Amino acid sequence: MAPKKAAPIAEPAVFAADAELDQAIDDLRGVLKKDGAADFGADFAAAGPLEQPMDFGSDFGSTDGAGFGGDFAAGFGGGLTETGAAGGFDAGSGFVGGDFDAAPIVGETAPGSGMTANMDLIMDIPIDVQIVLGTSRMQVSGLMALTEGATIALDRKIGEPVEIMVNGRVIGRGEITVLEGDVTRFGVKLLEIKGTKK
């Protein structure tokens, strides 16, 4: 007799939710990378025009090398100043291709537009909210002895507020109520929302 082939196991809905969360996070990373690349270099234009040559020699006291122990041109090939090689980099010679201030920044976005796009992505991420009616502490032997119809005593009394939790963290308290539009379902009326500060 041939063995029966089992039907393929379907992925639970949990994996689908994880895939949606991963996609939302990847989309957020893409927006952050794109947003960061658009702003790169925008602060360089505010530094001032590059038409004036930089004077690094004034930082060292002298531009002829005397502050470092002598004339370097004479020690290394001498007469370089006569051949024009000592001219170095002339910022006005057009070497850099023009003025950086004159070039418009392509793809400049309005300030804060990246933040609103990021917030839209974040606001679409689903989270699980749990309502904790109460807890109970028991020994393993008591847990193993439970049968159908057994009652477990909770640490809260009737009418006490329940805890509202997100990711294992209490974010508020509320009271259990019956939904107005559907008397077969429960809801929670918020009594207190905890602040983010600890």
Curated annotation (Swiss-Prot):
Protein topology in the membrane: Peripheral membrane protein
Q: Which GO CC terms are listed, alphabetically?
A: bacterial-type flagellum basal body; plasma membrane
**Which keywords does this chain's UniProt record carry?**
Bacterial flagellum, Cell inner membrane, Cell membrane, Chemotaxis, Flagellar rotation, Membrane
What GO terms describe the biological role, i.e. biological process, of this protein?
bacterial-type flagellum-dependent cell motility; chemotaxis
InterPro entries, alphabetically? FliN (IPR012826), FliN-like_C (IPR001543), FliN/MopA/SpaO (IPR051469), FliN_T3SS_HrcQb (IPR001172), SpoA-like_sf (IPR036429)
Principal place where this protein is found? membrane
Pfam families in the cross-refs: FliMN_C (PF01052)
Q: Which GO terms describe its molecular function?
A: cytoskeletal motor activity
| Statement: the UniProt record of this protein carries the keyword Membrane | yes
Q: Which domain of life is it from?
A: Bacteria
Q: Where is this gene product found?
A: Cell inner membrane; Bacterial flagellum basal body
The protein's job, in short, is: FliN is one of three proteins (FliG, FliN, FliM) that form the rotor-mounted switch complex (C ring), located at the base of the basal body. This complex interacts with the CheY and CheZ chemotaxis proteins, in addition to contacting components of the motor that determine the direction of flagellar rotation.
Q: Which family does it belong to?
A: Belongs to the FliN/MopA/SpaO family.
This chain belongs to which protein, by name? Answer: Flagellar motor switch protein FliN
Please report the organism this UniProt entry assigns to the protein: Rhizobium meliloti (strain 1021)
